[in-house]
Amino acid sequence: MAKTFDVIVVGVGTMGAAACWHLSRQGFRVLGIDRYTVPHGFGAHHGHSRMIRLSYFEHPDYVPLLKRSYALWNELEEEAKRKILIPTGGLFLGPDDGGIVPGCLRASKEHALSHELLDRASVSSRFPQFQLEDGYVGFYESAAGILLVEPAMVAHTELVRCHGGRINGDETVLDWHASGDSVSVRT
């Protein structure tokens, strides 16, 4: 059965499902294809939750992307009418001269993120389950939280269908062929 779509997304994991949602709500005729039932337990999206945070210690350049991702998760929650991002706060512990805490501080200062730097005594007082060694500190970010990945996948795919898109699970892409301004996908 031949069908015509504006966009075909091969692989409906976390990224593919989100891409299908964004495209379908902009009015594109979208087909998402995955070789497994969507969602499934074979991808990086499998499992209950993932941590989400703004103070990205790896590099401050990621912070604008993370701010945008928080806004998009909020949009998804609003449209799907379900909770996907649960703010819990996040505590990061490490040597005061290590990579994690100084990296979080750098990102937070560069992007004016709300945070708390906790000395050893403050960590022990506020979080008694942690007794830090000399030279270790804590970094607390109230905006950090838990992202419910499988509910997010379900929300994305349900909304794709609400916007007129299709998600085909248990369908394997055998090959594809580009010709001019179109692409044929054979399953």
Predicted features along the sequence, with ranges:
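Short beta-to-alpha linker loops that shape the active-site pocket of alpha/beta-hydrolase fold enzymes
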Residues: 36-38, 121-123, 156
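A short, glycine/Asx- and small/polar-enriched loop/turn
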Residues: 100, 127-135, 177-184
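Dinucleotide-binding Rossmann-like beta1-alpha1 core, especially the glycine-rich loop
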Residues: 49-126
